[in-house]
């Protein structure tokens, strides 16, 4: 089996055989398929197995694998540019496109990952407000920056540890943890620390404790508290941006953040991130202001070209989001019916083209505490069952399942057929 052979050899040269922990399939537990290629809604491993892909590279591949327009943009650009570390026209084009098609971004700074975007956004908020503390929420994941690894979601959550070794206590002393979807908890924190709170950073749709949409009163309450105390509201839309809607979850909720972080979809499948917001805030970044942030590969021309091709295609085809919502509704309705018919305790949370299946007897999953009660042993069996039937979902109870525009009703039917035989 080439998959197993390649993975075993990978362990000799990469910790755990992977470059990101969840790829090791530790929680399932299986050896992961080693992916060779992808086309449209499908991926193929080194053993020749075909899977309908509902991971979509953890979100970015909303257009499907190897979309022709994105591939052509990469090919065309790479004939003349790989990297300059200098100003290019294509970075202007993508920056301008985002600023003119998004409602709440007046200026933007390109970086190379979601982690870079969120850590830079927090630094900017601290520099702008001249305050130290930030508020984040249990189970919300904002990357592996030390200040965020207090109570994180996803793989950290699965392993049942609150943070990470190697993070000094001093790094997290200014990070205050609140319960997601609990506005009273945040009010109490502001009553105590409001005068030194630089920002709230929040996923409007949480994706790394499973998908948990923020409640409208909760998110609006955060906006109001930030206004009252002079703190900034940072929406981490690394996962939800350009996915739940082109303009992100903030457009669905009608809430205006001060800073928005983006990544995943905006890079068209290449390493990319960005943060943007009000001009008066963004102008605090060097070289205009005192907040220093830099990057050799930031604004890489090939990445910018892939991102521009992706966002133009999404923005110019609003029917894509209509299709994704239709498929999402069908999948959600079908799984709920199977759960009822077979008496399998499940909660299905969905926002647009991202959703999660929680194996729990609770009636809802609204925060980290609820998510932790889910049965990961049953999920591991479910994952193996789905993989054996050619359905590729994330190997963790606490990761999202994603749709892309190349998925069809037939693919949804196959997903539901597999669930029905579990």
Swiss-Prot record:
Record-given protein name: Glutamate-1-semialdehyde 2,1-aminomutase
Pathway: Porphyrin-containing compound metabolism; protoporphyrin-IX biosynthesis; 5-aminolevulinate from L-glutamyl-tRNA(Glu): step 2/2
Subcellular compartments: Cytoplasm
Superkingdom assignment: Bacteria
Gene Ontology MF term list: glutamate-1-semialdehyde 2,1-aminomutase activity; pyridoxal phosphate binding; transaminase activity
Principal EC category: isomerase
Record-listed E.C. numbers: 5.4.3.8
SUPFAM superfamilies (UniProt xref): PLP-dependent transferases (SSF53383)
Catalytic activity: (S)-4-amino-5-oxopentanoate = 5-aminolevulinate
Subunit architecture: Homodimer.
Species: Clostridium kluyveri (strain ATCC 8527 / DSM 555 / NBRC 12016 / NCIMB 10680 / K1)
Signal sequence residues: none
């Amino acid at each position: 089996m080439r998959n197993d052979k390649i993975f075993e050899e990978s362990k000799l040269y990469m910790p755990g055989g992977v470059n990101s922990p969840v790829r090791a399939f530790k929680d399932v537990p299986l050896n992961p398929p080693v992916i060779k290629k992808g086309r449209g809604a499908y991926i193929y491993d080194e053993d020749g197995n075909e899977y309908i892909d509902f991971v979509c590279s953890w979100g970015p591949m909303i257009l499907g694998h190897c979309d022709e327009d994105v591939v052509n943009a990469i090919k065309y650009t790479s004939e003349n540019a790989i990297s300059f570390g200098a100003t290019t026209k294509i970075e202007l084009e993508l920056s301008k496109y985002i600023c003119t098609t998004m409602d709440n971004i007046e200026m933007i700074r390109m970086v190379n990952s979601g982690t870079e975007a969120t850590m830079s956004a927090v630094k900017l908020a601290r520099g702008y407000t001249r305050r130290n503390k930030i508020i984040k929420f249990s189970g919300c994941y904002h990357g592996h920056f030390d200040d965020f690894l207090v109570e994180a979601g996803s793989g950290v959550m699965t392993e049942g540890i609150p943070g990470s070794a190697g993070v000094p206590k001093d790094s997290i002393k200014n990070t205050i943890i609140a319960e997601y979807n609990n506005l009273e908890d945040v009010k109490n924190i502001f009553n105590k620390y409001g005068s030194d709170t630089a920002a709230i950073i929040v996923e409007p749709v949480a994706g790394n404790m499973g998908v948990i949409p923020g409640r409208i009163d909760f998110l609006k309450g955060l906006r109001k508290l930030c206004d009252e105390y002079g703190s900034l509201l940072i929406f981490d839309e690394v996962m939800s941006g350009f996915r739940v809607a082109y303009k992100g979850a903030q457009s669905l909720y009608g809430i205006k953040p001060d800073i928005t972080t983006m990544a995943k979809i905006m890079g068209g499948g290449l390493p990319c991130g960005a943060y943007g917001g009000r001009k008066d805030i963004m102008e605090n970044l060097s070289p205009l202001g005192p907040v220093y942030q830099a990057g050799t590969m930031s604004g890489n021309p090939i990445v910018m070209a892939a991102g521009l091709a992706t966002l133009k295609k999404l923005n110019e085809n609003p029917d894509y989001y209509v299709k994704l919502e239709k498929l999402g509704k069908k999948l959600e309705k079908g799984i709920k019916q199977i759960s009822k018919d077979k008496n399998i305790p499940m909660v299905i949370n969905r926002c647009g083209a991202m959703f999660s299946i929680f194996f729990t007897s609770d009636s809802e999953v609204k925060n980290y505490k609820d998510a932790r009660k889910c049965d990961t042993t049953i999920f591991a069996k479910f994952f193996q069952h789905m993989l054996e039937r050619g359905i590729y979902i994330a190997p963790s109870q606490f990761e999202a399942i994603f749709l892309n525009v190349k998925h069809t009703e037939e693919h949804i039917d196959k997903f539901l057929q597999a669930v029905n035989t579990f």
